[in-house]
Structures are given as C-alpha cells and as structure tokens.
Amino acid sequence: MMYYPDVPALEPDELELLCHEYLEYNATLDPHLADQMGVKRGLRNLDGTGVLAGITNVSNVIGYDKKEDGTIVPIPGRLVYRGIDIDTLAAEADAHDRFMFEEVIWLLLFGSLPTQEQYAKFRKLLEHHRELPQGFADDMILNSPSPNLMNKMARSVLAMYSYDEHAEDNSLPNILRQSINLIAELPTMMVNAYQIKRRVYDRSSMYFHLPTEGQSTAEHILSTYRADQKFTHEEARLLDLCLLVHADHGGGNCSTFTCRVLSSSGTDTYAAISSAIGALKGPKHGGANLKVMHQLDYILENVEDPSNDDEVREFLRKILRKERGDGSGLIYGMGHAVYTMSDPRAQILKTHAKSLAYKKGYDEEYELLCSIERLAPQVFAEEKHGPKKVCANVDLFSGLIYRMLGISEDLYTPLFAIARVPGWCAHRVEEVEFANRIIRPAYKYLGKPQEYVPLEKR
C-alpha cells in the first residue's frame, strides 16, 4: 500500500535514455585497473584483510595471526570489548542468570566495569529515558510511517536534533548525554515504528505499551513488542545475549566506520548515528540474518532429507555454483572478513539457541543450521580451491533466534541497530575526543580530458 500520493515521475523511456547516457560515458572503472594501480578496493588489502585506518581502545576483532612474510594463519576467533572477551561476558551472564547488555553499554562507553552502585543507577537512567519526548511519537512516527523500519529509525534519530537545545555541542559531557538518551530511546522508536507500519502497510492492528519499570533492555523490547506483553525469562535472556554479541565489532565495519567518518567532520551526534543506521540498513552489512532464514526455508523445501549430510552437502555445492538459491553463489551465514576458524558470536548463539529450539519445535531448523556450519567449509574448499578459510558467522543463528522469539522479520536488522548503537556512540566519542583529523582518503582519477563545447554549439 502506498501511504503517500504518487509524485510526478520520469517516464520509462526518459529513464532509459538517462541510463544509456551514463553508461556510455562511465564504462571505464574496471576493478582490475584498481588492482594494477595498488588501490585498496573496499579499503581491503589483497589478502582480504582491512587496511589499517585508525587506532581504538573500544574493541578488537581477532581472527588470524600474520607471519613476517604476510602469510595469514587461521586461529579461533575472539571479540574483545575494552579488553574483555565476549565469551567471558556471556559466561558471567550464564553463571548468575542475569542480563548483561546494560553492563556492556557502560563498558563500551566508559571503558570500565561499573560498580554495583553505578550499575544500578545506570539502569535507572536508561529506564528513565525510554519514553520519547512530548509530541515526538505523533509528529515523527505516527504521522509519517515508513515501510522500512531502518529508514524510519534513521529519520527519527535525525529528527531528535530538533528536540535538543544543545544538538551542536560536541563537548564530552554533551555527547555522552546524547548517547545515553539515544541508546535508551531507540528501542521505543523501533517498536513504535513497527506498530504504525503494521497499521498502514500491513493493514493489521497496532498496539502501544508504555515502558515498564525495572526491565532490562531485552525485557523492554519484548514487553512493548508483544500484544499481551508476556515473555519468559529464558526468552528475554536469549534476546539480551543477541544484543550483547552485536554491541560492537571494531572500528572498521561499515556502519561504525561511517559513524567515525561523519564524526571526524565535526558534525552532530544525530547526523553521525543516523548515518550509521543508514549504513547498517544495506543488505551487504546488516541484512544477512534475514537472508540466512530465507535460504534455510529454501533448503528445507528442496532437500528431501535435511538430516542427510550427503544431500545437504550437494545442495550447498549447487548454491555455491549458482545452480540453486538466489543465484548469488553465497551460502548465507558462512564466511567473514576477519574470522577464519570460528566467530565467537556464532558459537555463543549456537550454544544458547539449542534449548529453546527443541522446546519450541524448531529442532529441524536448528540441526540443519548446524549441518550447514559443519559442511559448508568443506564444500567451499572443494569448489574454490583457495587458501581462504570460512566459518559460520553471527548471522547463521541470530535469525533463527528471532524467529523462535516470534519477532517479525521487519525487526531483524533494526534489532542489530539497537544492539550496535552503544558501540557507535563509543567510537564517536573516541573519534571526537582523540582523533582530531577529518578522515579523507584519496581516489585515483581515471577520466579522460575533453574540450568544453559552448551550449549553443551542442
């Protein structure tokens, strides 16, 4: 359903003419030329590793060792938040059966573990700021719905500028204030945007629940998302774990680097964070877990016996050869730019998803994902004949967890944004406080000289 009236549009023949004009004069950007000129396409080295573009204290992504001759040595993956492995954080949450995301927010923002008193006050602070400013929900969400929640969240964050008397103040106290507010408000923005999207575009009922006192971020999301506001402790803990493992991933990933680039220009917090949401919206960055679920359903529909390794292996081979699936040749949920032997996030989610999968009748889906994790590296090695190692990434199991929690596919990527905003804010603070230099890489110009011809002679 189109909510807004149609606007005047270019006719198809006009668009075709414009496309022809563009392609005629812009067909010279051959990727091989970039390689020959030593250009680091995608800010990647030839071995696939990222170009070193900055330094950070926020987090570290470890997936390989490098020998003196440049050879990459695969190792088990690690993700470290402010010097602490996420495995340690997840184990702590398990040992005491408690929510950990709020502690991770503090850790990423400030670099330390909060004391008990600081932790209690910080949770109260986040609770206090979950409600949106007076009139914001009506003006920015209810009266201007969007079929895409990431689009709506980016616009909502940008609009918060108008509700902040000190929006342009880039001092440390003010950026921290803005960061805490956005971290608290974004889940409410997401759920509200989803409800109005249901009403306008899906023609379904919408329902709005006020935040409940004493809830963690994960509990707040489930409570405001579900019509009956009911959820189990196990469900909330599993969602909290998803938020924990997605909270940050180094300074070089697309959305975080986008946030750093904008922050380096001296722009405001709302512009920087909305741009990060826009980057995460891209299917090459934040939408992979949805593609995993679509591919999982496709395999279940087309493989006679999903428990048979030989059948699954050969079907994965056909996907890799672009003979089946969406034609991309990608096995979604497998492979990563940094991790080689394992992605610690995937291992944490895999371990914790099993119990709920068997309780809720998703054991077939869970076991098939485990088979894909086990068989895909072998198929990849046989088909590609290269040295690159592939392993399951965080997307392989996160989509199944959201499905088991009854969460709409509309919210898969927005939940990623909810989890990642503390990391974005931590990197923004670091960029503004310490970098002090605008990020400005170079591009090699390949255009040909041409004479200017006066308009009357053309």
Predicted ranges, named:
Residues 2-458:
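Non-transmembrane, aqueous-exposed alpha-helical and coiled segments at domain scale
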